């Protein structure tokens, strides 16, 4: 049987891994200037868009928080997988 403590530890490891991966891909999203964010976003996420289109997108999305969205998705997927493991072990 899998203990809740082990499930929690596994979840924390996955979130830490996800954060590390995220920060290695998008270090400029934390405390960076808008031009740099625009350039990196364009390279990583919107290669077919112009700089102005990416900047317009950022200006239209003031509440956009890719880190929060990524963590929510990772947490959901981790919970699903760990829940399945717990159920199988039980």
What are these regions (language model features)?
Residues 3-4:
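Short, charge/polar-rich alpha-helical segments
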Residues 7, 11-25, 39-42:
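N-terminal acidic leader/helix
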Residues 21, 88-90:
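Residue-level recognition of conserved structural "scaffold" positions that shape functional pockets
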Residues 26-88:
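Acidic, low-complexity, intrinsically disordered interaction modules
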């Amino acid at each position: 049987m899998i203990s809740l403590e082990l499930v929690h530890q596994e979840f924390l490891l996955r979130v830490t891994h996800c954060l590390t991966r995220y920060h290695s891909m998008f270090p400029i999203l934390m405390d960076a200037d808008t031009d740099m964010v625009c350039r990196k976003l364009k390279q990583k996420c919107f290669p077919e868009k112009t700089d102005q289109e990416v900047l317009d997108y950022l200006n239209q999305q003031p509440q956009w928080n890719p880190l929060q969205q990524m963590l929510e998705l990772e947490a959901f997927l981790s919970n699903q997988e760990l829940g399945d493991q717990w159920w199988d072990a039980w």
